[in-house]
């Protein structure tokens, strides 16, 4: 215990007084009776409660949230999480699990349905057999989780040190297996993902894999991704592999070149240049390594921040950046798109860079920026005009005002837009008023207002826009209604953060926006994940155990399935019945 804390011994806790009651019993009675004697009229009517329970090692073993229900957690003897079960999984008798190797590194994670009765003991956070109460062994030598389940789903396996597959078969930068082994020692060699996994599944039967080859310094030298959906033939086990090779400055660690699919038809190369402070100053690309296109070059202020970006080898755009004294972004290019007012002079008769296509400024408080250059007044002419500037000064980093200038597809100047923002005491935006500027003449345009409940959920949203006749008209007057749900402990109906439906008081809108919804438009599963949107024709949404969308079923019969790699990145989408597949 901490210094100054003297714990009761078991003998002291079990010692009885004259009435025969132990000290431990009297402590428990006091706790119970003291709560009963509390004056409930002095207590607030708490709603949307989130509750936590911990074991004696201060590990979270149980939690209950307003939308996510009850989740239980189990740990091994070393305090590592080995299993969990949320409200969705309880109904399906499913558990999420994690396994470790002898060095404590995660080697497998996924979900399982046990073949024997198991449960998580809430008070201790241990995984036990339901019939006997004995603790489930999670040691490597006891073959956890095979000892409780034959089949698992959505499994990610991580392999260290070496691969069971020949490295020379996978990597183009490996010629000697022993050299490969020496650079991957104690490093991740491969990450495998399996939709289905059983005790008979071979390592090579993965759905997706990521392989790593390192240089002697531990930098990734080659990264190979193998998506079997991309395989052109089943006869070649390497078909579908995509390889990316990296070249580094071995002193600074900077990436000098990235080559995708070297020597293949889809080869593409990025090359990077740096200054003496290791800041990137140029990016070039090529599909053959001989003819290069400059994508961008960068310049910096003496104190570090990015000062200018020039895009393309033809210098199609220049982006100039200005910052406040606090380091907050003040503006990009300027507000008027006038070459004489641009910080970089782009588009002027003496410049090789095309005229700016966009510019904007951000204002925080009056006098938040003063330039050391000569174009300050003209670069931010609208922000500095007393008749245009918002008087709602903010000193916490929130933006009080934004000025935006753009050109259209025909390179004609659009009206400059100035937006004023207001916030509540919790820094939530509550109002936006937009105006169009013609010279210094202000014409009100877009505006919106927001209100929230005490839990931060939107209650009302009002929006107005400019119609085709140039008049400002109401577009939305939205009212958000939230569901009541059944408390899993008490069985009573309680409030939640789950949106039930959105009412729009503006009838007959011609803006192709959100239409008025009926009560109960949205439905959710036991852990608060959206599973139905009636108005959008979404009949059901299936979710993976890691919280990513697995499949969407629509009322018209369309099914959209999504696929992921072992790191959780989306790698594919399939649409049925059209049977159209997109791979990433």
How would you name each of these model-derived features?
Residues 1-534, 539-542, 548-553, 559-575, ...:
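Beta-strand elements of repeat-based all-beta scaffolds
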